[in-house]
Amino acid sequence: MILVLCMAATAAYAQTDGAATATSTADSLRMDSIIHALPEVMVKGQRPVVKVEGSKLTYDMPQLLKKEGADNVYDALKLIPGVTDDNGSLTLAGNAFNVLINGKHYQMDAAQLNALLKSLPASRLKHAEVMYTTPARYEVRGASINLDIASDTSQPDGWQGELTGAWNQEHEAMWSERGAFLYHHNKLDIDFNYEHDHGKSYRTTDETSLHALDDGTTHDIVTDEAQRSRDHKHLWRMGLDYAFTENHRLSLSYTGSYNTEHAREDVTGNVTAANAYRTKKKMHDVMLDYQLPTGTTLNAEYTYYDTPSTQQLTSTLPTGELHFDTDEHQRINRWKFHLGQEHSLAGGWGLNYGVRYSLTNDHSWQAFTSTGDNTAAHPADSYSRQNEDIVNIYAGTNSKIGKKLDFEASLAAEYYHSPAWHQWNVYPTFSLTYIPSSSHVLQLNFSSDKKFPDYWTLQSFTVYSNGGYNEVVGNPGLKPSSNYRTQLVYVLRHKYQFVAWFNYTDDYFVQTPYQRHDRLTVQYKYLNFDYSQQWGLQASVPQRFGNWLDSRLTVIGVWMKEKCSAFYDIPFNRDIAWVMANLRNNFTLVPDHLYLNLDGMIRSKAHQAIYDLPASGNVDVGLKYIFWKKRATLHVFCNDIFETSGIDPVIHYGNQNMKMDFSCYRQVGVSLVYRFGGYKDKSKEVDTSRFKK
């Protein structure tokens, strides 16, 4: 309790009113630049929560969820030791991770990850398998969490389902309705999910910029920006699974979504402007998966993604006026195919190998139309149609050496072809788990990866915000980054976890602002740095106090360094150490029925490129009530009670001088979940990580 009160007081004291989630296309792009990454050993003395299986740490999610208010997968993942919510991005031991659904590939950026994971009921989760290094057979690289949501064949034939309604209030209200249904009969499963999110949002951004130009003039730009938006988001899925035998299964699924957004941005101060956005996003995905009892897997998937949007800008700046409309569009067609094989060999050895091929067609364009007298020419129209081909060949092996040692290694060779790049890459992975005794587990991991920019980022586009004073532009010359990561994981007494890691990223890229000298514009653009490196330590310590309080303290310490010798005319080489602490407390008020959650987080100041990021923190409280023979759950909560979770970045570096102040509102909400028929949801997610946001 003392720790809780200290953390609450610290979070209340931090002067960090800040960032709300960006809603428009321009602001979501601009916000990208501010912060983004054995023999079974079980817990004794209580029901097992985590066990070590080779290179995996497997968590019993129903046990972790029992006393928590999480009703969706996003909130459920935050209960896993080492997973934190870093300003809207989930991280594992301070780094980004992949999400797998029943071993299938799932990769998203922070915004898409939030939206899709929040649409999935937490009740579907059986286990979560944490892999700090993911073997090549899973198609992804780096750290991963595999979610086990296989259907429960022990349930009787008939219908099962879950209905959810939710209301969240910040400055404006958002509503959500979700229905998920499953029909089980003998060897056949048919499922259908639908979710509708809708409501309004409001946020403000106050920006101060001391802007020097080549003509010797200096402009003191002060703007106050208010943005109002209205959203409707629809997500649906239909799936069919037929199990011929235990290891012989055919699956067919269709997933679709349709989202609309209407936003208006009004700017006052040195810049006066009205800026209206309209966006529609449509996605259709069909996936066929066939698993044979011989260990062979066949998979084919087709995805269609279409995002038209418009912008209407009328603006008066100190240097002139802008009046024009913008139409932009991205259309993606993607095909994926996978053939894999696994063998169980003598002596406890395992062997897996396979080949993957994907073809993506990206059709993007942007057109400008003048609607008045402009003192500056708008950018030229752009048009692009290009294909991307990826061939991946992999092989891996795993084995148990004696009673104390497990290892798994894999190697993937990948050929990437696009108009910008033609190259082969090799990705080794290695994981070694050593168990000297039942109370100690040591795991050493190594992985390598290459990150490719979003398709839209590579286009010659320009999107305006802050009344046209800010420009978000593409970079066709942006190079992919190469990442190398090593971790050492130590599990003590089956519950205390400690992780040490080192990351090195060559050609690291991130979006950064720059006050141009030739004209009065702040340009936001993704650029390659020389490198980024990071040393980190994490400790996760759970503690139970009788039968009335369960607590877990997670502390992360990081030393990071970023170097860019070609950052316009102000190269930088910056390093900083920062610390983040997270304390979760769950009070049992009435066993099996009523629980109180009180959580807090605090983070010290940090750097990103030439940004200085101040300290931030938050305190959240929630009440969970289970009733109606445990079929209904009511959750009432208030997040960020003291409105201190936002980050207001400052730039005072070289000839760059800027400060941003983002609105920050506490969030209150209520959700009600009703389940019938012993419902266990299942879902397959679609990779839209590199599509236009």
Show the residue positions of the predicted features.
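Short, acidic, small-residue-rich periplasmic hinge/interaction motif at the N-terminus
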Residues: T16-L65, D85-N87, G94-A96, Y132
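N-terminal periplasmic accessory domains that precede
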Residues: L29, V73-A76, L113-A115, V140-T164, ...
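Extracytoplasmic beta-strand/coil segments of soluble accessory domains associated
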Residues: V50, Y74-D109
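Short acidic/polar hinge/loop motifs at secondary-structure boundaries
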Residues: Y106-Y132
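Face-selective signature of the C-terminal outer-membrane beta-barrel domain
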Residues: L188, K233-N259, A276-P428, I435-S439, ...
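Outer-membrane beta-barrel signature, preferentially recognizing the C-terminal barrel domain
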Residues: K450-V499, Y504, Y524-G536, V541-R544, ...
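Gram-negative outer-membrane beta-barrel transporters
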Residues: N528-K605
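Conserved C-terminal beta-signal and adjacent last beta-strands/turns
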Residues: D575-K693
